[in-house]
Amino acid sequence: MPSANVSPPCPSGVRGGGMGPKAKAEASKPHPQIPVKLPFVTAPDALAAAKARMRDLAAAYVAALPGRDTHSLMAGVPGVDLKFMPLGWRDGAFDPEHNVILINSAARPERQRFTLAHEIGHAILLGDDDLLSDIHDAYEGERLEQVIETLCNVAAAAILMPEPVIAEMLERFGPTGRALAELAKRAEVSASSALYALTEQTPVPVIYAVCAPGKPPREQAASDEDAGPSTEKVLTVRASSSTRGVKYTLASGTPVPADHPAALALATGMEVREESYVPFRSGRKMKAEVDAYPSRGIVAVSFEFDPARLGRKDSEQADRDEPQDAAQ
């Protein structure tokens, strides 16, 4: 579900970062909830501190809830109404002026659940003047909006996938595609939502990816125009995220070769783990230990690297050949 065209929530009286009427009006616009990978961080320490604070706030929020079903999640925001309605391409919105959270009724239940937690994240953020002030001091404009959306995704992950649950998945399955699939199942969220939460907590160099059958990439479709229309579906990357120390991800839409472990896992319905490679879109390959786990029509994949190899021959070659696959 990876950058959202959104606007930040704008309470009045924010220390060091007050907003005018125009910004306040922007805050109530509906917006999609898409996990955001930030391309450039001008103040990494500020963002890291803000994420840590947001996790603490979300953990405190969850601790006071009677449960984690939809009704229980709303218990921490008394006075705020929850409404489900068709929202087109938008996933949801939080309108602080009218105290209402809107959720797209046409979205899948897993998507609705993450969206609700994300919108609750907006409410949590609005309730902490110090954190709001800090991020307004450090960022502005579109970058501020991106940071706010990122913090709300951090909150959503902390609400639905708390650190002890992620730690349990990593302990049981290691940093693998199966850990990703099991986390999504346990938290009742999509694998794309679980992707970013797992990435944040994985201590070793890994690229995680969610792959699913879909239409052939545009490049391939264009080359096959003379052959006429095709109904064949190709396994492609839907979302990807990398842990600290790994500078690349797989771009959305990257095709997965038919002989790759991920394609084999989809074809057989069985987990496949073997020494293989990262299939960059250009055709270049980077060695990695691959674990591909099929689940509910998708394949959750991990590409684990030998730390000693990072920054050496393979990654230097990727650096020259794969700028389009750099982490977004």
Swiss-Prot record:
Keyword field contains Zinc: yes
Keyword Phosphoprotein: no
A Gene Ontology biological process term: proteolysis
UniProt binding sites for Zn(2+): H118, H122, E149
Enzyme Commission number(s) of this protein: 3.4.24.-
Disulfide topology: none
Enzyme class name: hydrolase
GO terms of molecular function: DNA binding; metal ion binding; metallopeptidase activity
Region (Disordered): 1-31, 217-238, 309-328
UniProt keyword list: DNA-binding, Hydrolase, Metal-binding, Metalloprotease, Protease, Stress response, Zinc
Pfam families: Peptidase_M78 (PF06114)
Location of the active site: E119
Recorded domain comment: Composed of three structural domains: an N-terminal zinc-peptidase domain, a central helix-turn-helix motif, and a C-terminal GAF-type domain.
The protein's name: Radiation response metalloprotease IrrE
Organism: Deinococcus radiodurans (strain ATCC 13939 / DSM 20539 / JCM 16871 / CCUG 27074 / LMG 4051 / NBRC 15346 / NCIMB 9279 / VKM B-1422 / R1)
Chain's gene name: irrE
